Regions:
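Alpha/beta-hydrolase active-site loop
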Residues: 131-155, 358-379, 398
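Cap/lid segment of the alpha/beta-hydrolase catalytic domain
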Residues: 118-136, 325-327, 350-362
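Short, surface-exposed "cap/lid" segments of acyl-processing enzymes
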Residues: 78-108, 114, 312-342, 350-351
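Catalytic histidine neighborhood in serine/cysteine hydrolases
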Residues: 113, 255-271, 347, 472-487
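The feature captures the conserved acid-bearing segment of alpha/beta-hydrolase catalytic domains
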Residues: 198-253, 310, 424-474
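Post-His helix in hydrolase/transferase enzymes
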Residues: 271-286, 488-500
Length: 508
């Protein structure tokens, strides 16, 4: 994607040199949290016909176009970024009060992506009104926003974001967190949370654990997510007359990973900063410390974003997993856990982090070879099961074909989950907006695997997978579940992968 000129007032010395894509110099209307929005106008006017913002805002903010979120504000810290927050406004839009909160977070080293809930709900409404509209996976929208902005502003590495929402935004970010696979977000911070919210007529997918009941006002009343693994902090004013503090306490008490920060002198408007700002900074810092603390890595591979899932099995095999472009999250975590439960230790290479910068097939193969040599020795194993999911599946055949002969001989199986027709060796915005596909073709690389046992797994209705079209006899094929996520049938995936490696023959 070509760079576009013009980027409104990024603070000098920031790590981000230029934004890619469409930029806007529109500024947000200045108001207070909880204050009523200005009179409704056309969507274009909402983005561009605002009052000027304070000078403090122009010292930090740039605006870019971000799909369903419309124009988003991006705030850059003075030094190297330490974390990323995606901040969704209340019904009043991206105004002075939430802008001040964003500035407070940049002082903690955060890049803050500020989104106007009015733009987002308008997009949801449009999607919901289409004939045969499916349920909406709002977690994917927030994840894509984080990916896009971090890539466009030139972040040197990807940071798993914290979700923050005020008022109506507080409810929406809770829903996104409950939907999301583990590892997608660092957690969420909800300021002024109510369980009921109008999602513009959209039905929400359950995802990893979101449940709700529609009420007579056509709102969705969200339920506590008992299985929520990522931390959720309800930041609640005890004088809030819009969202009951007692109701929030009762809601959070049913979620094991939830905390409530009680603010005795605060109402729904969060108007007096001294009554909540210290606690706000502290709550955010707790979420970022939890996710950003680097795990200790073996010296031989300490430059690689690896994740170990040990196991106590006495077998002679381990698994190496190349993740999808979402990183170490969701299916990748669940599959690794299932393999480990069967006695097969697993190490993952986080594709989102590793391919954040461009790689070559040879470079990737060299790094995977380093991982293999390390774990063959460290774990005392003789064979390896190579597994790739989605982005990682596209890359994996290129890697195997470039491994040294001694390592290639120890590959028990190559397992391609959701492989596409083309591979990419750099995470790009096109991968998230569905316009990728210009990379090197995967079919010739799969064919070149020769006598190496290959299992190609696809979901029912998965139109992008090359598995069904591969020549019969050369590659074993298996259809599991539905779609690109295999209906969450992780146990079946693990069972099929292990069975194939131990008895390498075609699977139908």
């Amino acid at each position: 994607m070509s760079q576009q000129p013009g980027f409104a007032a990024i603070r000098a010395g920031a790590v981000c040199g230029a934004l890619l894509g469409t930029l806007s110099v529109a500024r947000a209307w200045a108001g207070e949290p909880g204050q009523a929005a200005p009179p409704a106008t056309s969507s274009s006017a909402k983005l561009h016909a605002h009052k000027p913002t304070p000078a403090a805002d122009t010292a930090y903010a740039a605006h870019l176009s971000a799909g369903r979120f419309g124009s988003v504000a991006v705030y850059i810290p003075e030094g190297p970024p330490q974390s990323v927050a995606v901040f969704l406004s209340g019904d009043g839009g991206w105004e002075l009060g939430v802008v001040n909160m964003a500035h407070a977070l940049t002082a903690l080293g955060a890049v803050v992506i500020g989104a106007d809930i009015r733009n987002y709900l308008a997009s949801l409404k449009s999607a919901a009104q289409r004939a045969g509209a499916p349920c909406q996976m709002i977690a994917a929208d927030f994840e894509s926003l984080s990916h896009q902005v971090q890539k466009e502003i030139g972040m040197s590495e990807y940071h798993v974001p914290v979700l923050i929402g005020y008022s109506s935004g507080a409810t929406v970010v809770y829903a996104a967190l409950a939907q999301s696979p583990p590892g997608t977000f660092a957690g969420a911070l909800s300021l002024g949370f109510c369980a009921d919210q109008d999602f513009a007529g959209a039905a929400l997918c359950p995802g990893a654990g979101l449940h709700y009941t529609p009420n007579q006002q056509h709102e969705l009343v969200l339920e506590p997510a008992a299985s929520l693994r990522q931390p959720w902090i309800a930041f609640q004013g005890q004088k809030d007359e819009v969202c009951s503090a007692h109701a929030v306490d009762a809601f959070a008490a049913q979620i094991g990973s939830a905390q409530v920060v009680k603010l005795p002198l605060v109402g729904h408007g969060f108007s007096v900063e001294r009554n909540w700002m210290p606690q706000f900074r502290d709550a955010y810092a707790r979420l970022t410390v939890r996710v950003e603390a680097p795990a200790a890595r073996p010296t031989a591979i300490n430059d690689l974003p690896v994740q170990e899932v040990p196991a106590m099995g006495a077998g002679d095999e381990f698994a190496l997993l190349l993740t999808g472009d979402g990183g170490w999250a969701g299916l990748d975590q669940e599959l690794a856990a299932r393999l480990a439960a069967e006695g097969v230790p697993t190490v993952g290479l986080n594709s989102l982090k590793y391919f954040w910068t461009a790689r070559t097939p040879a470079e990737t193969a060299n790094d995977v070879a380093r991982m293999l040599r390390h774990y063959f020795a460290a774990w005392g194993k003789q064979r390896v099961l190579l597994v790739g999911y989605s982005f990682g599946a596209d890359v994996l055949p290129f890697v195997v074909n470039r491994l040294p002969a001694d390592l290639r001989a120890r590959v028990a199986s190559v397992n391609l989950l959701g492989i596409d027709s083309n591979a990419s060796f750099e995470i790009s915005i096109a991968d998230w907006v569905g316009s990728a596909g210009g990379g090197p073709p995967t079919r010739p690389e799969v064919a070149a695997l020769g006598n190496t046992p290959v299992l190609c797994i696809y979901g029912e209705g998965e139109t992008d997978s090359i598995c069904p079209g591969l020549p019969a006899g050369g590659v074993a094929r298996a259809q599991i579940g539905k779609g690109h996520h295999f209906s969450g049938e992780y146990a079946t995936l693990a069972e099929r992968i292990l069975g194939f490696a131990r008895q390498p023959k075609p699977v139908t």
